[in-house]
Amino acid sequence: MSGGTFPAFVSAGDILTDMVRAGDAQWTSVPGGAGWNVARAVARLGVPSALAGSIGEDCFSDVLWRTSDAAGLDLRFLQRVARPPLLAIVHETRPPAYFFIGEASADLAFDPARLPAGWTDHVKWAHFGCISLVREPLAGTLAALAADLHARGVKISFDPNVRNLMTAAYRPTLAKMAALADLIKVSDEDLRHLFGGDGPDAVAAVRALNPRTAVLVTRGAQAATLYADGDVHEASPPRVEVADTVGAGDASIGGMLFSLMAAPQRSWREHLAFALAAGAAACRHTGAHAPTLDEVVALIEG
């Protein structure tokens, strides 16, 4: 999607190609990136969206461009530069084992100054997270962008979405982004990696980073908890036949953000139900599926 209007939602940072082992000497390339998945999820549900990031001019980046266009994302926010692509090499899938190839790669060249003039006057929510907040100089660029948007009154969503690049050096960025956020989403895996456990103490540590913000804690097929406006809401995801859990967390936060933008009159409990249904709908498909509104509503209505 391009044109004179501006998206209400922008996800900034993560867009890459997953190289997934398909045999001893075979690999399959798949468009990916947590931030990109969230942008696609929100767009598929019905809110005009964009992925603000940078890709190369190579064959992998051509696929990312075409797939972003097909997903309805605003291509004015996706920059192209003459640099190599960022690749995630997924050499095992059960459980996932991976590493990244991306020295001086295209994602690091993202420049907010090249985004279309006036977009910040129209965006309602902006999303940040995952490896883009670890890889410099991109991490600093995105943290500064988040701070600027926050100062302008744009609501900020933050999902750490833990990857193996997040060492102790990530802590200051975690604290900075959490302080800016109006919504923080963490999984039980995030809690274990960042805080050494997934129990009440770990949840309390997340909430202490920004006591005023809403915090969504997901636990796969188990009950999720939402802390918001002084209340605690708990709900279980709809039961579905699981084909794949890849991208389920991205679909879940995408569902939450869509619900907050499209139906702000809903209660927090209703927003939580929508988010969990979106994540469950994604699990019915292989790959990082962006569910339709009909799929999500059908699960909510049972």
Please provide the spans of the model-predicted regions:
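Active-site metal-binding loops of divalent metal-dependent hydrolases
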Residues: 13-15, 34, 131, 160-162, ...
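Conserved phosphate-binding/catalytic region of the ribokinase-like
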Residues: 1-8, 199-302
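Active-site beta-loop-alpha junctions enriched in small/polar residues
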Residues: 103, 131, 161-165, 189, ...
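Glycine-rich phosphate/adenosyl-contacting loop at the front of the ribokinase-like
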Residues: 1-73, 242
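Conserved phosphate/ATP/ADP-binding segment of small-molecule kinases
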Residues: 152, 165-232
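Short beta-strand/loop segments at the ligand-binding rim of alpha/beta enzyme cores
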Residues: 152-160
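Conserved N-terminal subdomain of the carbohydrate kinase-like
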Residues: 19, 48-130, 154, 300-302
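Short, conserved phosphate/pyrophosphate- and ester-handling motifs at nucleotide-, phospho-/glycolipid
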Residues: 42, 187, 249
